[in-house]
């Protein structure tokens, strides 16, 4: 999978980011190493019933950490980063599947297109099922229904891989299954129910990540206007590792999470012009506007009734 290309606002920004990257903090990757210690250390220690809410947080945080590992942090060695993200605390998918689909998602000109962008919430006209998608497109539906749809789609792709004998994908799922079995055996040994973990912790943690992805992208003609800037509060920024500044991340996928906010604040007005004002003042704004009212993310406007991409959206 080709590495995503960085897109700078201007040469001055390129030079400024280069200066940032030479700082001790960026070179050491200390914030990401501390995050790894927190997720692995505290997750292991909090395996008791009253700690459910904290376990949901740390499991969702682990999913954010996996994203950071995919983009080359804290080391430049993909195989080592994969070791740090392979433990199936997220349960529902292998790290390799997330890595490959997410890197495909970073093709700017294909962003939001349902056939080509694996993370698109849009559909072709043929696959759009009105009532179910409208429920998923409400804020509450995104929390309750979207994780279930994602899990069903992921398991469906796994079954297809076995049916078509895709050896590499089958091996990836077998490794994931073995690690998951070992994790559940360890939980059971500690007297912590794996079923409780799946239903009361892992599913809610996956739902929590759907807060970030709610209207994270829109189907605009200009690829630069397709990713949101969400000026979220501190708690959400920490949980999502600053991916609320999503437009900045898509321009500069190699920038570590602790640099995204600094870069955005240095160029706030320029980024807001660049993404055509696709800016929201925190996740509470989505909650107020779309708690029970569906957002218009359904059949992709760039696809005609035959399911083919119109030229102006390619």
Q: What residue spans do the PLM features occupy?
A:
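Extended hydrophobic/aromatic segments used for targeting, binding, or gating
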Residues: 201-233, 237-240
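Short, function-defining helix-loop hinge/capping sites that tune catalysis or transport
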Residues: 75-76, 114, 218, 225, ...
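Juxtamembrane helix-capping/reentrant segments at transmembrane boundaries
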Residues: 74-93, 115-130, 223-236
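Short, charged/polar micro-motifs that form catalytic or ligand-binding hotspots
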Residues: 88, 92, 201, 250
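Short, motif-level signal for alpha-helix interfacial/capping segments enriched in acidic residues
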Residues: 38-50, 84, 194-197, 219-234
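Residue-level signature of the transmembrane alpha-helical core
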Residues: 52-53, 57, 83, 87, ...
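Non-catalytic, topology-defining segments of multipass membrane proteins
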Residues: 1-61, 65-66, 88-195, 258-314
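Histidine-centered catalytic micro-motifs
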Residues: 63-72, 98-111, 212-221, 239-255
